[in-house]
Amino acid sequence: MRKLALLLSLILGVTSAYAGTNINGNVESRCTVNTDTAGYYGNPNAYTLTTLPASAGQVPIIRIDTSLATAYKAQISYPTSFSSSPSLGDTVVWTGAVAVDQTSSSDMSGYQAASTTADGGAMRIYPLTVAGATWFSVASVATYGGGQQKAFPGGSYTAVVTAECIAQ
């Protein structure tokens, strides 16, 4: 009898039922990054490009808005290379600074002191512990010639500030 039942189950192909059901969801970021003021380089001498206003430059201002306290950190870097430029045959030395320029709440007054640096100092990381808006200035100076003060070739130069919200 057992052999007959086994034989019938093999012939009839007993199968099990299976269903796979997806569960979908979307998460909307509660942190946004916007350019509040576009930056541009002034050229105070042949070998320097700078965003400093005293040299006819404009420091870019980045605004980061978060509606959820302590859920994000801001990660902002001044440029360390040109994204487009004439051909450069020598070294460009980059310096810069990222700083809190303005906040929507006095509770954010400790952001600069609480920040840390990475990427050789070019990147500054800010824990966003208070919901609201924070404006960051991102100064940048490019010096051509590796200390030899060589003139930049004529042409158009572009460098990119990187700013992002990172979920914690």
What is each model feature region?
Residues R2-L8, T48, D119-R124:
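Terminal low-complexity, poorly structured segments
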Residues Y18-V93, A97, R124-Q168:
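N-terminal small/polar-rich segments of proteins
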Residues M1-A19:
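Gram-negative bacterial Sec-dependent N-terminal signal peptides
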Residues T91-M123:
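Terminal beta-strand-rich extracellular "head" domains
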